[in-house]
């Protein structure tokens, strides 16, 4: 057999084996986890009381394409129920239209975001969700997914962390481009996480049940 013939056979064998080797190397690579989270260290939580915000909130619900600009406080410093009711309406479930009274602490945090980022409009990605899965803070009207145009979500995430004196959850969603902020049940530790999954990634449809357990309190009705 000539040297040229041998060289051609060797080259052919290398070309055939190359794709197989590449496929094996790809299989060996570990898949990157979409989610990572941990309890927040107590040493990282806020130790000083939060100053009272201005009360101003400019909020737009992305799915509903509605927005409001209100002050959650009356001139005497008490809560303005009519303003809270307008925000409750904006926080309503986009799928069912159900409305619940959202935790006022969440609205105070919204006002702090408004104050910190120079009065920019806050976009609400998700508020109250009328779902059967009652482990979600959205179900209990104590969570929100937000973003602000022109502000990086990392900056929003860091600011949200600075507001946590205990009992808050703060999540970063780089793929979807928003942060999650919630208030936890009494005694629950603060939690931090990053979720790289995109919209509707891995979500399963939940069957609706005819019987439902206790839910969050009814929505507030405007008083003025």
PLM regions and their residue ranges:
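Short, surface-exposed glycine/acidic/tryptophan-bearing loops
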Residues: 81, 125-143
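Surface-exposed patches in mature extracellular/periplasmic domains of secreted proteins
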Residues: 98-102, 119-128, 167-173
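Active-site acidic/histidine clusters and adjacent loop/turn architecture
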Residues: 63, 68-117
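Second-shell loop/turn segments in exported
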Residues: 55, 91-103, 143-147, 189
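N-terminal secretory targeting signals
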Residues: 1-53, 198-224
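Envelope-exposed proteins and targeting segments
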Residues: 53-55, 83, 87, 118-120, ...
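Structured segments of extracytoplasmic/periplasmic soluble domains
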Residues: 60-62, 90, 109-120, 149, ...
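Catalytic cores and adjacent binding grooves of peptidoglycan-active enzymes
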Residues: 26-27, 60, 135-144, 148-224
């Amino acid at each position: 057999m000539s040297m040229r013939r041998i060289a051609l056979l060797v080259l052919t064998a290398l070309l055939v084996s190359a794709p197989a080797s590449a496929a094996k190397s790809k299989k060996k690579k570990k898949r990157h986890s979409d989610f990572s989270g941990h309890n927040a260290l107590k040493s990282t939580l806020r130790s000083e009381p939060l100053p009272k915000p201005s009360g101003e909130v400019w909020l737009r619900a992305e799915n509903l394409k509605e927005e409001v600009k209100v002050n959650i406080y009356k001139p005497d410093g008490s809560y303005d129920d009519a303003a809270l009711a307008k925000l409750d309406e904006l926080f309503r479930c986009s799928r069912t239209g159900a409305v619940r009274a959202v935790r006022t602490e969440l609205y105070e945090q919204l006002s702090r975001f408004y104050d910190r980022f120079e009065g920019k409009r806050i976009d609400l990605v998700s508020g109250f969700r009328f779902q059967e899965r009652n482990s979600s803070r959205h179900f209990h009207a104590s969570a929100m997914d937000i973003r602000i145009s022109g502000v990086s979500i990392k900056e929003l995430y860091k600011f949200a962390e600075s507001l946590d004196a205990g009992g808050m959850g703060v999540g970063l969603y780089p793929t979807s481009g928003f942060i999650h902020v919630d208030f936890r049940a009494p005694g629950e530790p603060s939690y931090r996480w990053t979720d790289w999954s995109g919209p509707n990634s891995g979500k399963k449809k939940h069957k609706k049940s005819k019987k439902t357990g206790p839910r969050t309190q009814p929505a507030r009705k405007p008083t003025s």
